[in-house]
Regions:
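N-terminal secretory signal peptides and thylakoid transit peptides that target proteins
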Residues: 148-168
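Membrane-anchoring hydrophobic segments
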Residues: 1-85
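Short, well-ordered alpha-helical packing segments
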Residues: 121, 130, 161, 165, ...
Length: 506
């Protein structure tokens, strides 16, 4: 293969990604979804339910964007190679990529024709970059065809490399600009720092911790709190621009802004959240000090009409969930949260406002970046995850896990401390028992329950001889219901079964 031919493959890829970098910079600056992210969102929203559910449970979101970029590498390389002899291929090929990206952008939430401008500019950057690279490559190609090498060939190669460096520079600067200079991202960070919310700092209640090394902290730091959402690029919403619309089966529509919300009577509570995708013994769970405003008074203010049994919540990015109305109105601390652990909500956890409803899995309750609530009935709605086979109501199930020792650990024979956590929000845990090597169940010591809406820690000391051992845990809730041993998958409404760990005493 001639050396200039290889250069065309490379030039096609470099020009293509220069256009993507320019698109990225513009969309970050204007707080719009980029073309690649829009395509990823489109693929997610239009994939079969089985694929979406697999992706949710297997970190599929992490590979979608890289997979799209890999496909683009191949497409751009082919465009570059074909453009060597047929320049119109570059115009048409990059144009086709732009059309697909633009079509995906127009399907994003709140899209207008104006969102096509960054796509168009990115397309021009692609064609322009390949034109510059192609001109230099054409000169090299002419020498290749004539079998002319030596100093003339080396000089033209230097010219080509200078242009490559310039195009790389444009791509790199565009990428950095998108990362660093995103207007609303910077403004949001400044806004969060300047907020003076009427909230208190968290104080961990006395007696809730069992003080065993290896048991996860009773209060989960915000940067360690689990993250599960469908967003490939999380929305950037400013408090000054935020509003919530409450409508549907109500006597009067209500629209409140951020200042209205924080001026209302506040509520603060320790609440444990866990994901419906959490496997038995999994770590998709956390406990935090949430501050906000109760949701029930707002709905009463709107005037709930007879027959309503659901609230369709919508996020700024268009994600939806259907929430049972009863669980909002029954007196639990269902809130519009504005702070987490005494600080404004982090962007990843829904800044400026998200919903928190104790006792329900997040897929039917925990809407981050919430902007709309429609009071309605379940037979009139089809929310994001229920469309994909998940249950309609989503009540949290009783669960427990062994955290100390971990599976595969080696411990000293004799007295061995076993410890972990248990939870069933809005009901509460009354007892936790463990079983060693299939023997009788024995009780454990519980940490104090801060409320029925938080997890509890537990511990026990057992006497073990040298050898391999298995410890199993089960919990009993405040109503006397014992955790089932029956293993069930997370789909459609949460996993069940006892958690066990295998370890060795030496």
């Amino acid at each position: 293969m001639k050396r200039s031919a290889v250069g065309w493959w490379f030039a096609g890829v470099l020009a293509g990604f220069t256009g993507l970098a320019v698109n990225y910079a513009l969309t970050e600056w204007f707080n719009q979804p980029g073309a690649v992210i829009a395509v990823a969102d489109f693929v997610r929203d239009h994939s079969p339910a089985g694929i979406v559910n697999w992706a949710r449970e297997n970190s599929g979101k992490k590979i979608t964007v890289p997979a799209i970029l890999l496909i683009l590498v191949l497409v751009f390389a082919l465009i570059g190679r074909l453009a060597r002899d047929r320049w119109w291929v570059a115009v048409a090929g990059y144009g086709a990529v732009g059309v697909l990206g633009g079509a995906a952008v127009l399907t994003t939430n709140g899209a207008t024709v104006a969102r096509l401008v960054p796509v168009a500019v990115g397309y021009v950057a692609m064609v322009g970059a390949l034109s510059l690279l192609g001109e230099r490559l054409g000169r090299l190609q002419a020498l290749d065809d004539q079998q002319v090498f030596g100093e003339l060939w080396r000089g033209r190669r230097r010219d080509f490399l200078v242009v490559v460096g310039a195009v790389f520079g444009v791509a790199g600067i565009s990428g950095i600009a998108g990362r660093v200079l995103g207007g609303d991202v910077r403004k949001q960070k400044e806004e969060q720092k300047s907020l003076r919310l009427p909230v208190t700092a968290p104080v961990v209640p006395s007696g809730v911790r069992v003080d065993v090394d290896g048991v996860q902290p009773w209060m989960t730091p915000a940067d360690e709190f689990y993250l599960i959402d469908t967003a490939f690029s999380r929305p950037v919403v400013l408090a000054e621009d935020w509003s919530l619309r409450i409508h549907g089966m109500v006597d009067r529509e209500i629209v409140i802004d951020y200042n209205d919300l924080i001026a209302r009577d506040g509520v603060e509570a320790w609440i444990t959240l866990n994901c419906v995708s959490n496997e038995v013994g999994g770590d998709l769970i956390g406990n935090a000090w949430w501050s906000g405003t109760l949701l029930a008074p707002l709905l009463r203010e709107a005037g709930i009409q007879d027959g309503a049994d659901a609230v369709l919540q919508t996020s700024d990015d268009g994600w939806t969930c259907g929430t049972p109305l009863t669980e909002i109105m029954d007196g639990r601390q269902a809130m519009l949260a504005v702070a987490m652990n005494g600080e404004p909500l982090p962007r990843d956890h829904g800044y400026p406002v998200r919903t928190i409803i104790p006792g329900l899995y997040g897929y039917v309750s925990g809407t981050k970046w919430v902007v709309d609530m429609e009071v309605t009935t379940f037979d009139q709605i089809d929310a994001y995850w229920t469309q994909r086979g998940w249950g309609e109501l989503g009540p949290v199930k009783i669960a427990s896990k062994v955290e100390v020792p971990s599976s595969g650990d080696e411990v000293s024979a004799g007295e061995v401390v076993v410890a972990g956590t248990a939870w069933i929000q809005h009901t509460g845990i009354s007892a936790v028992d463990i079983q060693v090597d299939g023997g009788p169940w024995t009780s454990t010591d519980l940490g104090r329950a801060a409320s029925t809406d938080t997890w509890v820690q537990w511990k026990a000391t057992v006497e073990l001889e040298a050898g391999d051992h298995t410890v199993t845990v089960r919990a009993t809730d405040a109503q006397g219901n014992v955790q089932t041993s029956v293993r069930a998958d997370v789909l459609p409404d949460g996993a069940t079964g006892w958690h066990s760990v295998d370890f060795t005493a030496t």
